[in-house]
Amino acid sequence: MIIDITEIMDWIPHRYPFLLVDRVLKIDPNKSITGIKNVTVNEPQFTGHFPARPVMPGVLMVEAMAQLAAILVAKSLGSTKNKEVFLMTIENAKFRRIVQPGDTMHIHAVIDQQRANVWKFSSTVTVEGEIATESKFTAMIKDKT
């Protein structure tokens, strides 16, 4: 099931310039999700990171992984309209390859564990088949107040 950017915006609250998932390529609710982020030179982070050699900040790659996982949570629950997904922990984040404008980040997230409102994930970002980033993280789903 392919989910385009318009539908992604129905599932998570993020918007430009902080929406970091362009398309979902595959989703298996309650299990895993795969999506992409096309990295372009006109993104605001590249004006300062770094002007002479633009590099995608590692923290934004982890954020893209978390946003993709939030889409997986929403699809697994059927909706998150009355809920919010908050990142709780990031563990063992590793950055193995520079990501720069022109690259396509292939993001994959897997649910490792889900207990009540706490979900644990493993995630990777690959570019041209090489691992760029990998991390484990935990998110909490709370009712909106």
UniProtKB/Swiss-Prot annotation:
UniProt EC number: 4.2.1.59
Alphabetized InterPro entries for the sequence: FabA_FabZ (IPR013114), FabZ (IPR010084), HotDog_dom_sf (IPR029069)
Molecular function via GO: (3R)-hydroxyacyl-[acyl-carrier-protein] dehydratase activity
Active site: H49
Pfam families: FabA (PF07977)
Coiled-coil segments on the chain, per record: none
Gene3D superfamilies linked: Hotdog Thioesterase
Reaction equations catalysed: a (3R)-hydroxyacyl-[ACP] = a (2E)-enoyl-[ACP] + H2O
Cellular location(s): Cytoplasm
Any one of the GO CC terms: membrane
UniProt keyword annotations, A-Z: Cytoplasm, Lipid A biosynthesis, Lipid biosynthesis, Lipid metabolism, Lyase
GO BP, one annotated term: fatty acid biosynthetic process
Family: Belongs to the thioester dehydratase family. FabZ subfamily.
Purpose of the protein: Involved in unsaturated fatty acids biosynthesis. Catalyzes the dehydration of short chain beta-hydroxyacyl-ACPs and long chain saturated and unsaturated beta-hydroxyacyl-ACPs.
Record-given protein name: 3-hydroxyacyl-[acyl-carrier-protein] dehydratase FabZ
